[in-house]
Every structure is written in C-alpha cells, then in structure tokens.
Design a protein with these regions (language model features):
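Substrate-binding clefts and catalytic carboxylate motifs of secreted carbohydrate-active enzymes
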Residues: 1-118, 122-126
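Compositionally biased, intrinsically disordered or flexible polar/acidic segments
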Residues: 104-280
C-alpha cells in the first residue's frame, strides 16, 4: 500500500490488516494461518480480541523498511476479531480491526457495542410509512422495526439506462467492518453509492413529511489514526423533489470512519405523487 511505504508515520500513521473483504477466510473454524498487515509505524502488535490481554496476543513485528510488510506466520486464530495496533516512538498511534466469520466470539466482543446511540428507534408520535434498507434485504432491527429490501420499486441508478445490466451495478456494496454507534451493523454494512443518477422514489399523498436519513463512511479513514483527516474527500447533496435539503454533506466530518450519521429533514409534498430523493 502506498501510505505504508511513502507516507511517514510522523505525518499520518496507519495500519491495515489484510483483508477487510475476506471475512469468510475462517468459515470452517479455528486453525493456524499467516496474518499480514501494512503499516508505516515502527512496529505492529497483533491481537485476537478487543483488549491487550496476553492470552490473545499474537506477537509484535518490526518495520523492515520500504517494500516490506508485516507477517505473523502460523498463528492460532481462535476468535472472530483480529486487531492490529501500530506503534510509533513507543506509543500506540493507529489501529485496524477486522471481523471473521466461522470463529468463536471474542471474549470482549461486546465492547464494539459500547457506543450504541440507539439512533434507529422510531420517534414517538410519528407513523412511519417506509423504512428502507439501502443496498440490502429485508431487515428487522433491534427495536423490532422492519426495514424493506432495496429494489427497483423504490431505487434508480445509472445502470437502468442500459439493457441487460444489473440495475445495481457499480452502485451497491457491502462492508464487514463493525459500525460505531449502533448494534444494527447489518443495516449500515449494506449500502448504495453513486452520483446524480442514484435516487429513491416513494409514493405518498400530499402533505408534510419527516424524513430520516442514515449514512456511514465505509472507505475513507480505514486503519488511520487520531490525526487522519479525510474531511472534504467525499461531499454531496441530497434533494427531495428537486429541492436541496442537505447541502455539501461530509459524512467523515460528521461521524468519521464507519460511524453512524443521522440527518432529519422536513419537506412538503404538494401536488406530487412521490417523494424523490436524488443524491449528487
């Protein structure tokens, strides 16, 4: 990775575990394996849990210079969490974490839920017409609320303009990272992305509507440090029926990497049969 080799740790320390897209690597259960990481730090410590306990410590590796990376060979991987901590001048400065399917839950796994903001709980006094799991399937959250599958009944993207293309092509992704601020990771781990041709349309009667929008930044900031700054790297607007309701939204600035971001807007749909939410 470029940053691991050519960005000094003094400027922007980082560590990246290989790989965030290989969650099923241990789907058949516990076994020994080689774990790799990229970092510009002086050394990296590897753990099989959320804490620094000796029982789940997998070893410390030193930085051997440009063109090399960190490797822990023949390690016993027992739990479903791998966590790498990068050290610079003797201090922990960067951290990365991946979740693995098929393994026993890490002893301190519940720490990943400690900042649950319960932001999905429906507001009292409101009748919710739609809840949609953007990019995902039907999902019932921790409050018993059903979020509908994202399908072409509601969403539109660029691929629909081309015959025989999957309508979700290059506008739908998933992440296996834990999501900070909620227990309902699944709802945020499936998502849509795109530019001006991504939109949602919902049939409604005339009236004033309260719209709750939920976001996360799944890419920028992975494996970074407290000094990592991704502000301004992804900025977009959200409109309702051609009127901008969120201008220059920067999810990183709102909630950082893999954090939940909630926005509430109010709009009046007069003489419309749909609420249309495009992004740009």
């Amino acid at each position: 990775m470029y940053r691991a080799n050519y960005v000094p740790a003094a400027k922007d320390p980082m560590v990246y575990l290989v790989s965030h897209t290989w969650a099923n690597r241990f789907e058949k259960g516990r076994r020994r394996a080689t774990i790799e990481a990229y970092s510009n730090c002086d050394s990296v410590l590897l753990y099989n849990d959320l804490t620094n306990e000796k029982a789940t410590f997998l070893g410390r590796k030193k930085n051997n210079g440009t063109g090399t990376h960190f490797m822990w060979e023949n390690r016993d991987i027992r739990y479903n969490v791998l966590r790498a901590v990068g050290y610079y001048k003797g201090k922990p400065v960067a951290e990365d974490l991946i979740l693995l399917n098929g393994l026993e839950q890490a002893p301190n796994f519940e720490l990943l839920y400690q900042d649950d903001k319960k932001i999905l709980k429906g507001e009292a006094g409101y009748n919710y017409l739609y809840r949609l799991n953007c990019g995902g399937d039907d999902y019932t959250d921790s409050f018993g609320q059903l979020w509908l599958q994202d399908n072409t009944n509601y969403s539109r993207s660029w691929a629909e303009n081309f015959k025989d293309l999957n309508p979700y092509l290059a506008s739908q992704r998933t992440t296996n990272d834990p999501i900070h601020g909620t227990r309902d990771w699944t709802l945020f781990q499936h998502f849509r992305f795109g530019r001006h041709q991504l939109e949602y349309r919902f049939p409604v009667a005339d009236g004033t509507y309260r719209i709750e929008l939920y976001f996360t930044e799944p890419w920028h900031g992975t494996g970074g440090s407290a000094s990592t700054d991704c502000e301004g790297l992804r900025i977009f607007d959200v409109a309702v029926n051609d009127s901008v309701v969120l201008d220059d939204l920067d999810i990183w600035a709102e909630s950082g990497h893999d954090g939940v971001c909630k926005k509430i807007v109010y709009t009046t749909a007069v003489s419309y049969t749909h609420l249309t939410l495009p992004t740009n």
